Regions:
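An extended, acidic
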Residues: 115-187
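Generic detector of well-ordered alpha-helical packing
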Residues: 20, 24, 43, 59-62, ...
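A structural micro-motif
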Residues: 4, 37, 105, 153-154
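DPxDG-like acidic metal-binding loop motif
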Residues: 49-108
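Short, solvent-exposed loop/turn motifs
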Residues: 85, 113-115
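N-terminal subdomain of lithium-sensitive/metallo-dependent phosphomonoesterases centered on the IMPase/IPPase/PAP
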Residues: 1-60
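Residue-level signal for inorganic ion chemistry
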Residues: 19, 30, 63, 92, ...
């Protein structure tokens, strides 16, 4: 896949050939697995539906990271029944890791059970942050957030892949993740 086949969806928000082709192939495969399910995907396939089952797909979370060959970037797939999430799977490409969970069950990384950290004090918390592409609208919130955390949290990182960072929280690598204005495919 050519990292240079890229379009700009909006200012600083990119879509690559890989996003589109990954989405096409995932939808094709999932359609055979559960034909009655609808789809909502980041690159525009499908929309929120009233169908009983709906796949929620981000075919390449962390597109900017992918374009620049920087980890992490991943594929994220969830299945919902109306508004209730039933399962989620995230494949983090750079680390070759597969995170998954089923509602009412445990969370796993490559078949091994994972847990969130037991850190409960902000001073010790290692926190992932995310900011949306529309930076002008979010600028006051982002500035306030960074100001509040700087010097109070044990550390912060901006990694560029919401799905991967949330999995890292589930595995105890991060203690929390903070971001507003996410799409349904990001979580």
């Amino acid at each position: 896949f050519d990292r240079n086949l890229v379009e700009e969806k909006s200012a600083h928000n990119y879509v690559s050939y890989v996003d589109k082709e990954s989405e096409r192939q995932i939808i094709e495969a999932l359609s055979t697995l559960l034909p009655e399910a609808g789809f909502i995907a980041e690159e525009g396939s499908g929309s929120l539906t009233d169908e009983e089952y709906c796949w929620v797909i981000d075919p390449l979370d962390g597109t900017s990271n992918y374009i620049h060959d920087i980890a992490p970037y991943c594929v994220s797939i969830a299945l919902r029944n109306r508004k209730e999430l039933l399962l989620g799977v995230v494949y983090e490409v750079c680390r070759d890791e597969c995170f998954y969970a089923v509602k009412g069950g445990k969370a796993y990384l490559d078949g091994n059970e994972i847990h969130v950290s037991d850190v409960s004090v902000l001073d010790n918390a290692f926190i992932a942050l995310g900011f949306p592409y529309n930076s002008d609208a979010y600028r006051p919130v982002a500035a306030h957030l960074v100001d509040r955390l700087y010097g109070f949290a044990g550390g912060t990182r901006l990694m560029g892949s919401a799905a991967a960072e949330l999995c890292y929280v589930a595995a105890g690598r991060f203690d929390a993740r903070i971001e507003a204005y996410l799409g349904p495919w990001d979580v």
